[in-house]
Amino acid sequence: MKISSKIIVLLIFISAFNLQKLQAQEEIKIGLLIPLSGKQSDIGKSIVRSVRLAINKIDNSNIQILLKDTENDPVKTLEAAKELGLEGVKVVIGPIFNNNVIYLDELKEMIFLSLTNKNIKN
């Protein structure tokens, strides 16, 4: 498993554990902003597999993962993040590329667990 996949799994465990303590019976919705189409789709699909493995290890039927395709596009990433917010998601894993983080500052009510930094220049 690549280092980024291990980090994602760790973030899921930490997020799920903390949310589970706060709301034991309530459904926990975690968003996943990843490229599922386009040139980077292989990375996105690998992350989906890693997240599903982590959720299976947690073995909590209250955790729901909501996938959104960013297509590695900043505007589509923002639109997908807003959709997740409308669906009640408060914690989002992703986006995974720094160019997709630039517009997410306006979504103050959501926590983004991104493995990138918007200050990194390509």
Over which residues does each language-model region extend?
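Extracytoplasmic ligand/sensor domains, especially the bilobed periplasmic-binding protein
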Residues: 91-122
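Bacterial N-terminal signal peptides that target proteins for export
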Residues: 1-9
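Hinge/beta->alpha junction and helix N-cap segments in small-molecule ligand-binding domains
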Residues: 67-74, 116-120
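Short, well-structured alpha-helical segments in soluble
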Residues: 74-90
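Bacterial N-terminal signal peptides
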Residues: 8-16
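Stable alpha-helical elements in mature extracytoplasmic
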Residues: 39, 43, 47-54, 77-80, ...
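Extracytoplasmic "Venus flytrap"
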Residues: 31-49, 58, 68-70
